[in-house]
Amino acid sequence: MTPADLAELLRNTAAAVLAERGLDAAALPATVVVERPRNPEHGDYASNLALQLGKKVGANPRELAGWLAAALAETDGIASAEVAGPGFINLRLEASAQAVVVTNVLDAGDRYGHSDAQSTHNINLEFVSANPTGPIHIGGTRWAAVGDALGRLLSTQGAGVVREYYFNDHGAQIDRFASSLIAAAKGEPTPEDGYAGSYINDIAAQVLRQAPDALSLPEPQLRETFRAIGVDLMFTHIKESLHEFGTDFDVYTHEDSMHTSGRVDQAIARLRETGNIYEKDGATWLRTSAFGDDKDRVVIKSDGKPAYIAGDIAYYLDKRQRGFDLCIYMLGADHHGYIARLKAVAAAFGDDPATVEVLIGQMVNLVRDGQPVRMSKRAGTVITLDDLVEAIGVDAARYSLIRSSVDTPIDIDLALWSSASNENPVYYVQYAHARLSALARNAAELGLIPDTAHLELLSHDKEGTLLRTLGEFPRVLKTAASLREPHRVCRYLEDLAGDYHRFYDSCRVLPQGDEQPTDLHTARLALCQATRQVIANGLAILGVTAPERM
């Protein structure tokens, strides 16, 4: 019996008890919360349903809890139901009911934990979207890991998800990039506002290999040649780095296309129809302050050129026209102002501002022995995705970046994350999977096959803890997807790995010496097989490998 099964049982029992006593069953919440007590002595699960309902139905919460506990105690699978404090209900499950989760996991396989909770959503998930003026920096690397994991997580809950990279190839930064390449090709110093790093010299050399006569071209053609070829080369490198990191996108949208295709003009025309565009001081303004922004925004500047937000407006409309009902933007720490701005754009088009969700990621620092690390020569003073992968590997890099809430700055200790020790969280989880894989190989050599026929024998405390943790996985995924918090999957996996290691140290799984295999051995083997499956499922969501050997 999983927590979801128990919650449904509790709700149905409460509905029957309330009806029997002439109380209002309509007061029942749509979702009943069942949690594991911090103190295992209080039971396997606990609920505060009676405390929630008491006042609503005109009953004393503790008395109501007593009615519910009495009814639950008569239910198959419930070993005991007791009232605690002002109206909590503590529940213990029978071993056979608790162990059903093993069968659930093995039957579902790599789909265990999946649901249709987000199936009504068609989501555009935009992340990374770094400027094509240099390698992916460490902040963008965090989004590459978290965004990819979030996309996988939302997919497990039934959402349609398109992962999208918005390619910022329009504007002043591209002009500075081209100027930097030209200076490098000529052997001149980097312009004052230009881009530095050996990658600029590398790209400039590649441009000259593709266009040997570029430096002899007139200025407009010279600049366009270095801009076009340089941006293409840089973006190719970015995509290769992301692919090697395990992050790929379904769609790449070019900002420049918003302007050259006329979509900016079309979007502004649509906004004029809503009455939310006006002219002032020779410029064209969007009335965003009417929709929660701190001020109105210039859309077309007085010189006739589109402001930066013009591209954002066209891009939002483009997403909606492609059929997305939810647009998630993952932005850097310096983009807090964009939250109100993007929601105001949605509202100006007549959409619910909730159509837009903005996640803001905080800073990432690399440390070794407590001291900041400066690594990259290729990108000047910037730490890049490639630097991090070179230092600790793809798995550790992804896991370390996903493991903390995105609104929390993080320090990545390179010594810790590259160590083969239990203090390294990704090693700890992966080692549990490798240990389980070795156990499966050893069992096969003995001719033992996991068997779910006698799961009621799994009555040891450590077995019970492991079973309950396995049962939590679907709820963890559902909650993590709903809150857009893939770090919850990391923390769950660490708890599961810990529960498994403690179980393994206390409960012998395989027969030793001349000992004959028993039903308990094969039941424990089934429990181990289920644990291995759930760890693999969780790591897959994170884009981290589940090694067979370590």
UniProtKB/Swiss-Prot annotation:
Lineage, broadest ranks: Bacteria, Bacillati, Actinomycetota, Actinomycetes, Mycobacteriales
Entry-linked SMART domains: Arg_tRNA_synt_N, DALR_1
Enzyme Commission code: 6.1.1.19
Gene Ontology biological-process annotations: arginyl-tRNA aminoacylation
UniProt motif ('HIGH' region) ranges: 130-140
Record SUPFAM superfamilies: Anticodon-binding domain of a subclass of class I aminoacyl-tRNA synthetases, Arginyl-tRNA synthetase (ArgRS), N-terminal 'additional' domain, Nucleotidylyl transferase
Protein's name according to its UniProt entry: Arginine--tRNA ligase
Matches recorded under PROSITE patterns: AA_TRNA_LIGASE_I
Subunit structure: Monomer.
Similarity field: Belongs to the class-I aminoacyl-tRNA synthetase family.
CDD domains: Anticodon_Ia_Arg, ArgRS_core
Coiled-coil boundaries: none
Family annotation (HAMAP family): Arg_tRNA_synth (MF_00123)
Subcellular location: Cytoplasm
Primary localization: cytoplasm
Statement: the UniProt record of this protein carries the keyword Disulfide bond: no
Keywords: Aminoacyl-tRNA synthetase, ATP-binding, Cytoplasm, Ligase, Nucleotide-binding, Protein biosynthesis
Catalysed reactions, as listed in the record: tRNA(Arg) + L-arginine + ATP = L-arginyl-tRNA(Arg) + AMP + diphosphate
Cellular compartments per GO CC: cytoplasm
MF terms in GO: arginine-tRNA ligase activity; ATP binding
Keyword Cell wall biogenesis/degradation among record annotations: no
